[in-house]
Amino acid sequence: MNRIGMITTIITTTITTGNGAG
């Protein structure tokens, strides 16, 4: 569960950064 949460956070951060940059 902890690993899933970390992966979700990384994916969310990546998407947010991509949208912000794009």
Curated annotation (Swiss-Prot):
UniProt feature coiled coil, ranges: none
Family: Belongs to the thr operon leader peptide family.
Name of the protein in question: thr operon leader peptide
Transmembrane portions of the chain: none
Pfam family membership, one: Leader_Thr
Keywords per UniProt: Amino-acid biosynthesis, Leader peptide, Threonine biosynthesis
Organism: Klebsiella pneumoniae subsp. pneumoniae (strain ATCC 700721 / MGH 78578)
InterPro entries, sorted: Thr_lead_pept (IPR011720)
Entry function: This protein is involved in control of the biosynthesis of threonine.
Superkingdom as given in the UniProt entry: Bacteria
